[in-house]
Curated annotation (Swiss-Prot):
InterPro entries: K+_transporter (IPR003855), K_trans_C (IPR053952), K_trans_N (IPR053951), Kup (IPR023051). Pfam families: K_trans, K_trans_C. This is Low affinity potassium transport system protein Kup. It is found in: Cell inner membrane. It comes from Yersinia pestis (strain Pestoides F). The lineage of its organism: Bacteria, Pseudomonadati, Pseudomonadota, Gammaproteobacteria, Enterobacterales. It is a multi-pass membrane protein. The keyword Nucleus does not apply. It comes from the Bacteria. HAMAP family: Kup (MF_01522). Responsible for the low-affinity transport of potassium into the cell. Likely operates as a K(+):H(+) symporter. Belongs to the HAK/KUP transporter (TC 2.A.72) family.
């Protein structure tokens, strides 16, 4: 390996530590404390401490190291990961009916992420700020205001991008993980017998001894692996090897040392259960640790916010969410984006959650159900990919799925039991997003089908216009067309009302391919349909943002010269009229109309100069 490659690998691995592992890396702030919360009724006794530590350790090994890093990360789409990517991969080589089922599962998984993303910033920052009650108990009433203040600052700076401060994320998180390791090692040295919990017999005996209560306690143990989906979702940014290298060399050892250090502290002083993480530190280090923990949780929150921006862009490009304004905050990095409506909706939800739950321990009950639900769906989708795409042996795939679900389903079931103590929150938020995504996709499809079902043949119309041409005016007209072989509504209405046609007519279709990026060479396909009509198909990946200026540039290189300021863009604007429906479809129609009215208009979506756009209205019944 060359020196340059080693330096590059080190830099990317460090960057992965700063972004990918923020959520799972801040879990030691609250996980072990929640295991002994009053919900489960466990006393701080050696066998219970050993049982929880053993469960946490083997959860990190089996779920993170084996399931995600070894298996799930094999399933990539041109290097990209994430639940929607896995959904699209799983649906490639199966029947349309089975594809529909997998799409529903994928959308449920994506919706779970929206539910989780509201909780992560709240519980992370609150658990860090709660260190104040250890350092200065009199400041306890200010935990909620301080948490809101920190997160307000974080959401405000989103519109400016995080490129400059983002350079500090990796060093800060590296210091954080080293601090976790040192604090834990210091405690383990004082009480080394805690290392016996590495033996899985303690986890097994914990279940045997405490039976049903131990099953309920899985709802707390799962807090140790929240954020595991980020490893897969951020695969496209950093690559598989750097993410794996960061986990096995830095993150996993640091987490294990810290959890076992907290366990050693509890064996020595059971009273430390009120906040075992901060009580690991000597008195002089409490304030620096509080500051470092706050920075780490802010970075973890930033990673989650960036993740929801990326997921939203992917959902928009794949047609599951209405078009919305997406602002690129970096000229160098296409992945750095800002979506105002998502940012401020998320901020409002996070603030309401902090005010409503007040303490991170109250919020912990709400955490986990979305994570484990996504884990179950990931297992099903991954095994479908292994069977249908990679042609693994069917019996091997069934065996693998059973092994994965033996781990996933008990954790999910344990968290479902927390439904009425907070689990309703991510489920409710996820349900809202699922309804929005399925409504937009299905109603949009029905609308386009209704608009095109009575449309005449495009080729026949062009032949008729060439044979008996209307009045021609100088210039180029571009008609946005959603389907390649359908006459654009705007063209029909222009001929109907204005009875003129431009010298050159371009029918432009934007197509989103099932890949993250499309190579520039394949960006534009041009077909001359007649002496005065051209069809242009512009292909983009779901990580890209369509841009008409770029399309015109590519057209010029292919021989079709179009000048932006000499071209008129004709677009149709549909006024939707709701027909008589059953009550549940009526409500869905109302939601679709509301989403359509607030969707980003095509000129803004494709960055077309407003003074070059002509919109022609039409009424459509839905």
């Amino acid at each position: 390996m060359s020196t340059e490659h080693k330096q590059y690998l080190s830099a990317v691995t460090l960057a992965a530590i700063g972004v990918v592992y923020g959520d799972i890396g801040t879990s030691p702030l609250y996980t072990l404390r929640e295991c002994f919360s009053g919900h489960y009724g466990f006393d701080v006794r050696p066998d219970v401490v050993f049982g929880f530590l053993s469960l946490i350790f083997w959860m990190l090994i089996l779920v993170v190291s084996v399931k995600y890093l070894t298996y799930v990360m094999r399933a990539d789409n041109a290097g990209e990961g994430g639940i929607l990517t896995l959904m699209s991969l799983a649906g490639r080589n199966i029947s349309s009916r089975a594809t529909s089922i997998l799409v529903v599962l994928g959308l449920i998984g994506g919706s779970f992420f929206y539910g989780e993303v509201v909780i992560t910033p709240a519980i992370s920052v609150m658990s860090a700020i709660e260190g104040l009650e250890i350092a200065a108990p009199a400041l306890d009433p200010y935990i909620v205001p301080c948490s809101i203040a920190v997160l307000t600052l974080l959401f405000v700076i989103q519109k400016h991008g995080t490129g400059s401060v983002g350079k500090l994320f990796a060093p800060v998180m590296l210091v954080w993980f080293l601090t976790l390791a040192l604090l834990g090692l210091r405690s383990i040295i004082a009480n080394p017998e805690v290392l016996a919990a590495l033996n899985p017999k303690w986890a097994i005996s914990f279940f045997v001894e405490y039976k049903s209560v131990s099953f309920f306690a899985l709802g707390a143990v799962v807090l140790a692996i929240t954020g595991v989906e980020a490893l897969y979702a951020d695969m496209g940014h950093f690559g598989k090897f750097p993410i794996r290298l960061a986990w096995f060399t830095v993150v996993l050892p640091s987490l294990v040392l810290n959890y076992f250090g907290q366990g050693a502290l509890l064996l020595k002083n059971p009273e430390a259960i009120k906040n075992p993480f901060f009580l690991l530190a000597p008195d002089w280090a409490l304030i620096p640790l509080l500051i470092l923990a706050t920075l780490a949780t802010v970075i973890a929150s930033q990673a989650v916010i960036s993740g929801v921006f990326s997921l939203t862009r992917q959902a928009v490009r794949l047609g599951y969410l209405p078009p919305m304004r997406i602002i690129h905050t970096s000229e160098m990095e296409s992945g750095q984006i800002y979506i105002p409506v998502i940012n401020w909706t998320l901020y409002l939800a996070v603030v309401l959650v902090i005010i409503g739950f007040e303490r991170s321990s109250n919020l912990a009950a709400a955490y986990g159900i979305a994570v484990t639900g996504t884990m179950v769906i990931t297992s099903i989708l991954f095994c479908t990919v292994a069977w249908k795409n990679w042609h693994w042996n069917r019996f091997l795939v069934v065996f693998l799925l059973m092994v994965l679900l033996i781990i996933d389903i008990p954790m999910f079931s344990a968290n479902v039991l927390k439904l009425f103590s907070g689990g309703w929150l991510p489920l409710s938020l996820g349900l809202v997003m699922f309804i929005i995504m399925t409504t937009w996709k299905s109603e949009r499809f029905s609308l386009l089908r209704r608009m095109h079902e009575h449309s005449n043949s495009l080729e026949a119309m062009i032949a008729s216009l060439e044979k008996s041409p209307p009045v021609r005016v100088p210039g180029t007209a571009v008609y946005m067309s959603r389907a390649m072989n359908v006459i654009p509504f705007a063209l029909l209405h222009n001929l109907k009302h204005n009875k003129v046609l431009h010298e050159r007519v371009v029918l432009l279709t934007m197509r989103t391919d099932d890949v993250p990026y499309v190579h520039n060479v394949e960006r534009v396909t041009i077909e001359q349909l007649s002496p005065t009509f051209w069809r242009v198909v512009a292909r983009y990946g779901w990580r890209e943002t369509p841009n008409v200026a770029e399309i015109f540039h590519r057209c010029g290189l292919e021989g079709l010269s179009c000048q932006m300021m000499e071209t008129s863009f004709f677009m149709s604007h549909e006024s939707l009229i709701l027909t008589k429906r059953p009550w549940h479809l009526f409500l869905r129609g109302k939601l679709f109309i509301a989403l359509s009215r607030n969707a980003l208009r095509a000129p803004d979506q494709f960055e077309i100069p407003p003074n070059r756009v002509i919109e022609l209205g039409t009424q459509v019944e839905i």
